[in-house]
């Protein structure tokens, strides 16, 4: 081919190629500047800018005297740029000992190289961040630690630790209310988030001379509680001792202002530290966060007799001097209901309350009848929520009036066949002794701005007036006698007029009564002439030989009141300090010697009756009781028993399970029961001599109370 033609052909071909490339480039530019423009712009902005949320500080929660119970503190978010991490394992192994992260979850996030920043951990302390900064500064370039960056975050801090933990509640890592007041007042406590945008280099460092924008967050409003942190500390200290001494499954204690319904303390043990909750064990955390004082129901037992007595007096079916007779049992429509102990014989209504006599309260309930009794029970707030400002409240259980049987009514009279929450029991009992007003319990007294200005103030609310003031006056005196002469002696405090009532309730599991397992409780108030404060202590499933409320709950109510009353400025009415007696040391003594020693100083004893030597005592040596107070003597398992000594088997025929257990333990024997009700047969027979520790087999039939 002619050289000139060849050159022209090459020029033509080159022109076509260049034209094609130009057209392709133009088309690509057109695409980039039209359909892909937005996404490319966004990607570019992500590369040289960093945007984020400014977490709002939650409102502060303080007690009634201004002490901080919950506050938002500065923490940090630790992030990393996956694009700067070439060796993921080396990177994670370097930071894990300091940051304590979930390596598997972090590994997955770091594998996404399309993101410029991933969160490794939130709510990290300043100390940890400082350690990471030092680690990053000292690390070589190829370590990947230059990918780390830190931003301010907010965490919730509880200065008193586990104190009031269930009531205050918990927040999530995102600073959202999860339980307790944190959840109930989420809309009040949470603030308004802010945001920011800044220009950064490839290592997420802000570029000098560049501008961004920053919208600050707004702190949430705060809460002022009716809780007194100092009283709460008194209560929690006593409840820790209570659960340990009684080896109880759990304990609850409420303290309230009798006249207003304000809650001064609320303790539920076991508890947890909200600064370090077991977040990795959801089941355990859920159980620990439960507000059992308002959500769990229980048969109140004899503390309920406060309500029955008040109803009967107010309705006119009885008077304090009214005569009754207790033969240790009473039959209602063929159902035999037994008293808790030996027959009380002839007694007045006032004696019946002091003695906590079941037959007296059965008769009072039947005298009133369904319509009258239920009118009072409804006025006391039973069967409905109290309205306390906490989440998860239960209404309790009350058989409807149209479905209640006569025997049900009889049992309700002494605290069975009815279930209340602790807060219901306290508020109802308060109305009996505060002049007859059922108050709505409340725990938040004010909502405040972040600057401390009051936005809303909550006032005492009267929900009903169950009884007349005159009836309330009478009930206060009757309940004072329970503490001074009856089963509440262990709650007496020298110089103070204390009223109250003990209770021992059955425990149900799978719909059946659990043998030898009870809920002991004590409700008390002071001073009797002008009640200011009340207390309710509930001890669930104590693992001690005698688990009545008078021995498991009352001593700890006394311990709290003895410290709390002077703190509240409630002075003793007299200086009868000589009536306060120091409990002597009794361990190692025989039962006879221990009883004589107690009698000499003016104290009384209660024993499990198992053996002959005192192994332990409650209250311990050195504690103070008023004259006539009870000291528990524990003898179970004494090594002083002689194995060869024969024991005479007692006659148990016709006795109930409680009396059988008492007599059997007194002889150092054990027993096994079949059936429910009263003993109809036993083996070995009464009068036979057996070795200590022998099991007596009992056949029970008839009523099971």
Model-derived features: positions:
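Periplasmic/cell-envelope proteins involved in peptidoglycan metabolism and beta-lactam response
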Residues: 1-278, 371-383, 392, 491-494, ...
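Beta-lactam-recognizing serine transpeptidase/beta-lactamase-like catalytic domain environment
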Residues: 2, 70, 201-214, 253, ...
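Extracytoplasmic
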Residues: 54-57, 64, 72-75, 115, ...
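Soluble non-cytosolic domains of exported or imported proteins
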Residues: 56, 82-89, 122-126, 175-179, ...
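Preference for bulky hydrophobic residues occupying beta-strand positions
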Residues: 78-80, 122, 187, 225, ...
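Conserved NTP-handling cores and scaffolds of large molecular machines
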Residues: 82, 99, 136, 171, ...
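Generic structural signal for residues in well-ordered beta-strands
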Residues: 148-150, 253, 324, 498, ...
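Ligand-recognition elements built from short beta-strands and adjacent flexible loops
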Residues: 495, 509, 516, 537-705
């Amino acid at each position: 081919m002619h050289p000139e033609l060849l050159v022209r052909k090459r020029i033509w071909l080159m022109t076509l190629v260049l034209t094609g490339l130009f057209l392709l480039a133009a088309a690509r530019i057109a695409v980039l500047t039209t359909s892909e423009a937005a996404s490319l712009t966004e990607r570019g902005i992500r590369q040289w800018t960093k945007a984020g949320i400014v977490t709002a500080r939650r409102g502060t929660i303080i007690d009634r005297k201004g002490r901080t119970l919950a506050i938002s503190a500065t923490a940090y978010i630790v992030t990393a740029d996956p694009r700067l991490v070439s060796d993921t394992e080396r990177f994670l192994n370097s930071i894990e000992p300091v940051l304590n992260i979930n390596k598997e979850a972090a590994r997955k996030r770091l594998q996404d190289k399309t993101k410029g920043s991933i969160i490794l951990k939130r709510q990290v302390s300043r100390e940890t961040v400082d350690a990471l900064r030092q680690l990053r500064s000292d690390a070589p370039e190829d370590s990947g630690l230059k990918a780390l960056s830190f931003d301010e975050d907010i965490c919730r801090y509880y200065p008193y630790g586990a104190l009031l933990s269930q009531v205050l509640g918990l927040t999530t890592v995102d600073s959202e209310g999860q339980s307790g007041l944190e959840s109930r007042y989420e809309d009040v406590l949470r603030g308004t988030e802010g945001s920011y945008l800044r220009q950064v280099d490839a290592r997420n460092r802000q570029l000098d001379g560049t501008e961004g924008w920053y919208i600050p967050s707004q702190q949430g409003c705060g809460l002022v509680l009716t809780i007194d942190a100092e009283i709460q500390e008194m209560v929690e200290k006593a409840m820790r001792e209570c659960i340990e001494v009684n080896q109880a499954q759990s304990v609850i204690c409420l303290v309230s202002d009798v006249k207003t319904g304000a809650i001064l303390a609320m303790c539920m043990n076991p508890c947890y530290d909200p600064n370090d909750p077991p977040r990795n064990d959801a089941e355990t955390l859920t159980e620990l966060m439960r507000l059992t004082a308002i959500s769990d129901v229980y048969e109140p037992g004899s503390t309920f007799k406060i309500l029955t007595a008040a109803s009967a007096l107010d309705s006119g079916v009885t008077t304090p001097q009214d005569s009754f007779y207790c033969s240790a049992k009473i039959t209602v429509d063929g159902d035999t209901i037994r008293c808790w102990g030996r027959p009380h014989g002839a007694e007045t209504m006032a004696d019946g309350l002091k003695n906590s006599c079941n037959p007296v309260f059965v008769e009072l309930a039947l005298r009133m009848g369904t319509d009258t009794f239920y009118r009072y029970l409804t006025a006391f707030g039973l069967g409905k929520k109290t309205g306390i400002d906490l989440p998860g409240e239960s209404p309790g259980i009350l058989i409807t009036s149209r479905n209640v049987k006569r025997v049900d009514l009889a049992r309700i009279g002494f605290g069975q066949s009815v279930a209340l929450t602790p807060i219901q029991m306290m508020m109802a009992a308060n109305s009996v002794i505060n002049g007859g007003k059922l108050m709505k319990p409340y725990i938040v007294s004010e909502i405040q701005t972040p600057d401390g200005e009051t936005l809303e103030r909550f006032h005492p609310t009267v929900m009903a007036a169950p009884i007349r003031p005159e009836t309330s006056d009478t009930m206060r005196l009757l309940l004072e006698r329970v503490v001074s002469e009856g089963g509440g002696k262990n709650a007496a405090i020298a110089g103070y007029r204390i009223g109250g009532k003990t209770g021992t309730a059955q425990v149900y599991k799978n719909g059946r009564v659990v043998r030898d397992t009870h809920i002991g409780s004590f409700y008390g108030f002071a001073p009797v002439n002008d009640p200011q404060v009340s207390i309710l202590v509930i001890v669930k499933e104590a693992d001690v030989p005698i688990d009545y409320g008078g021995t498991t709950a009352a001593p700890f109510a006394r311990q709290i009141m003895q410290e709390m009353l002077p703190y509240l400025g409630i002075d003793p009415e007299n200086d009868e300090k000589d009536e306060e007696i120091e409990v002597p040391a009794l361990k190692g003594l025989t039962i006879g010697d221990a009883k004589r020693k107690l009698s000499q100083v003016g104290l009384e004893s209660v024993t499990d009756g198992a053996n002959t030597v005192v192994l332990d005592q409650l209250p311990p040596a050195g504690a103070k009781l008023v004259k006539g107070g009870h000291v528990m003597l524990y003898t179970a398992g004494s090594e002083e028993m002689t194995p060869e000594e024969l024991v005479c088997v007692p006659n148990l025929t016709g006795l109930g399970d409680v009396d059988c257990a008492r007599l059997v333990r007194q002889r150092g024997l054990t027993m096994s029961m079949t059936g429910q009700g009263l003993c109809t047969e036993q083996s070995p027979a009464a009068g036979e001599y057996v070795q200590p520790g022998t099991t007596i087999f009992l056949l029970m039939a008839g009523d099971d109370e």
